[in-house]
Amino acid sequence: MAHLEQFGRVSRLSYSRIKEPVELPNLIQIQKNSYDWFLEHGLREALQEVFPISDFTGNLELGFLDYSMGEPKYSINECKERDVSYQAPLKLKVRLTDKENGEIKESEVYMGDLPLMTEKGTFIINGAERVVVSQLVKSPGVYFNERMDVAGHPLFGATIIPNRGAWFELEMDSAGLVYTRIDKTRKIPVTVLLRALGYESNEVILDMYDGDETIARTLEKDTSTNKKEALIEFYRRLRPGELATEDAAEQLLKNLFFDPRRYDMAAVGRYKVNKKLGLNIPPENRHLTLEDITATIGYLLKLIKGEGKTDVIDHLGNRRLRSIGELLQNQFRTGLVRMERVVRERMSIHDVETLTPQVLINIRPITAAVKEFFGSSQLSQFMDQTNPLAELTHKRRLSALGPGGLTRERAGFQVRDVHHSHYGRICPIETPEGPNIGLIGYLATFGQVNDFGFIETPYRKVDKKLGRVLNEIVYLSADEEDEYYVAQANAPLDENGYFIEEKVEARYFEEILEIPKNRVDYMDVSPKQVFSVATALIPFLENDDANRALMGANMQRQAVPLVKTEAPIVGTGLEHKAARDSGAVVIAKKAGTVKKASASRISIEKDDGTIDNYELLKFMRSNQGTCYNQRPIVKVGERVEANEVIADGPSTEQGELALGRNVMVAFMPWEGYNYEDAILISEKLVKDDVFTSIHIEEYECEARDTKLGSEEITRDIPNVSEDMLKNLDDQGVIRVGAEVRPDDILVGKVTPKGETELTPEERLLRAIFGEKAREVRDSSLRVPHGEAGKVVAVKRFSREKGDELPPGVNQLVRVYIAQKRKISEGDKMAGRHGNKGVISRILPEEDMPFLEDGTPVEIVLNPLGVPSRMNIGQILECHMGWAARALGLNIATPVFDGANEEDIFTKLREASLLESGKTILFDGRTGEKFKHEITVGYVYMLKLAHLVDDKIHARSIGPYSLVTQQPLGGKAQFGGQRFGEMEVWALEAYGSSYTLQEILTVKSDDVAGRLKTYESIVKGENIPEPGVPEGFKVLIKELQSLALDVRILAGDDHEILIKDNDNEGNEKEKARELGLDLPDNPVGRMLEITQPIENAEQDVELKSSPK
């Protein structure tokens, strides 16, 4: 039955029928736990693997005793301001022992800085917030596979994959012989390897495998008869062309598999091998053993006889997660190994008397490895900070790409597909559309990572004898779960936990079966354990098609934080948890009473009388340029409990996630303005700032040292009117609060110009005024084309004040410009069910369709967008939202355990609305009734980050490409619109030859023609005939580079010479006369000119002959 439930400070009418026996875990613990493991264990493991380091004689030994972390130099916010990393120094306590004279030197050595994880599970690297994504990789272990030969007979194979070291493979050929390959080299009969390992005679080998005929056949093919021959044969195959000796072969074999420094299958590899082959080798033993090799061969022989099972590589029992801790440990180990080499060399070179640990240890390889990992690894990503949900899901992202993983091109359908072992571990819905589909996934809500890196999911234990579900929770990994029957979370139970029905629906491998209740082993803890956080935020998910649910989950992450936030009327109950764990809201550490609450700080007096201060972030710029702002939701004198939300962040309301707004929607066509998913909205949404968002852009200007002198930030800029300088302070930096438009000066800066030959007049001035007359050019920071707004903050850094700046930079000024963007035509909007569209028209409020009581609807959506897309959830949300708004309720309808149709009808009746959820609407323009009843209700709509202001673009004069001399493309390059092949056809179809000629020549890449045309426009003359486009010249040059003798001949067969851009000087003069300033560097020139072509009017044809 529906019941009221409290979510933080908000109560919702919840329709959930299932009491969840286990709380949701902290949603970013995957990041935090992994990094904590690294600091406590991973770092020590890596250090113990490399230390102690001995020199080549064995006299000197550098051992490691302990390590400690210092305090970070700056706070998190200071790091963001100063563009530095949030990190702490790592110090090692080491001991240098001289074994000859027994001398011991102990000291503490600084080992560089290690980036620290913030409370929110992120890292600050060079001032930018970054996330390290967990990687899904093939687990170390032993794998058996099966393929078909040409005749259709099964061929089996086996591979032992280590964490690091050589791969050991076994394979069959169609003759039924077993071969081995080591590290993808040439294959050798497996019996050669067995002999080399010490099983010399045929009898011993046959005995070991009970006279197996496959082995007997392989022995016939084997030419070696004893260990020595086998070793030499083995060495020849692995190192062809080198001299094979018994000792070298023995050493090679030992190094390949039995040396812990070169071969490591990690604890997880040992666990997998023991489990698959039924061995009991202790977990400390992480290299291969004889037992591993013989048991692997044994299992392969069993497979040939039809016993045992092959492995599916996409099963989550065979794929594990490498999270931040392990990734960083591997990187750190790489650095340590490089350092070890340096230490050894220094031990041999330096004098023993003067040696100290500080002299030996070179930390550069370590700091370089760590820096490289955080700065440029594929898995260390710039955090998606569009809204709190985007932050949260980015930290829970699982990627199969990256170093040691898959590549997009090689990944087939098999790897990308949903597998039954994903249940409760990886979300089957949320994944990107496009080339990464299925390679990037998201952790399911209850998923956790065990010590081996496998994802586990919780289940309730079932007492089979009684048929009763217990409240005992067991976490199972994918391979452990395979042996059990698992019932669904919504299997009917009585109040004591007994199954009501005799037969229960349960999962077993990929099948869903109906089985007697006494065969059930476990039961799901919650219906939402299958899905990720973003998917579990979609109400009525069970009524949506999976493809649209995927779009809904992905688009919630793109919702822009609005100025006025509003939590959804129809939610799923997960909004509170998602907002809390994202780190966007402020949470009270201890209980107490609010003493002071202002916009920027909350003070709470704890029960022991001391005061906790919480600083709030105000109008900060997020990574994506959205506005990050926190505001208090507690009042002075209010009692606050520990872990209670006391301030809202972006996209939250009363501690709940609030990505969009609840708006009244009608599903009807309107004059074709909602054709093809377009959206018609009311002007009310613009006027009332319903979908208004704030966007903050950062611009920076640095004054550097140049060869000709230092740049200077100043108000004194040459050739600039006083009007342009009116908002600059006396240093030449814009004041906070100024409204700026494109091309306004933000920071005045001048750069020294190169000395040129001075005229006599200039020499006289120089003599009178001294240095002052030195030429400088204006290199001020200006507002880019198409941007505008208000200056909200200015930050200044200078070397003189002791700020850390990059080399060569003396001063740095950052200016932040905020824009208030109201919703407008061309903006993209979406619901939570994958129903997205672009706003096509904003209608005056009075013209919108209205209800019988005169209320105009706010948005009109096209009903044809629903049936074919099969996302009926939006209609149910619309009905439920209307009823809930009328009754003044908030609803929680969890996924697969929420309100059904009957509940919706009941609520509509309660609210005195028609059970159909439809009503009569009137046309706002004429006042007439529409013919049919129309579905109306409240839907939660989001404004997405694809805003028209960022996409719209126009160009007049701009940069040209250097080679083709055609305008560049794209908004970022201030490019033009390409008039391509198909567009040319369109003009050809109309026969508009002059328009076409103009587009393909003077408006594009006829360099001389461009300038002449500009000249004639300036002088008011007729526009001259176009010349030959630069692209044509490039084509000729390309053909000539292929050794084709290509020339242009006129109608009377005499050659027309094409001039190159060598006559630049006088054309620059001409351009200057016209008031055009041509830059000196050719890349990105505004206008380029070359020699005009003679005889261009003549008939031109292309003739080619091979040279």
UniProtKB/Swiss-Prot annotation:
Residues 1062-1075 have a biased composition (Basic and acidic residues). The keyword Transcription applies. It catalyses: RNA(n) + a ribonucleoside 5'-triphosphate = RNA(n+1) + diphosphate. Its EC number is 2.7.7.6. Disulfide bonds: none annotated. GO terms for cellular component: DNA-directed RNA polymerase complex. Pfam families: RNA_pol_Rpb2_1, RNA_pol_Rpb2_2, RNA_pol_Rpb2_3, RNA_pol_Rpb2_45, RNA_pol_Rpb2_6, RNA_pol_Rpb2_7. Belongs to the RNA polymerase beta chain family. NCBIfam families: PRK00405.1, rpoB. This is DNA-directed RNA polymerase subunit beta. It comes from Syntrophomonas wolfei subsp. wolfei (strain DSM 2245B / Goettingen). The gene is rpoB.
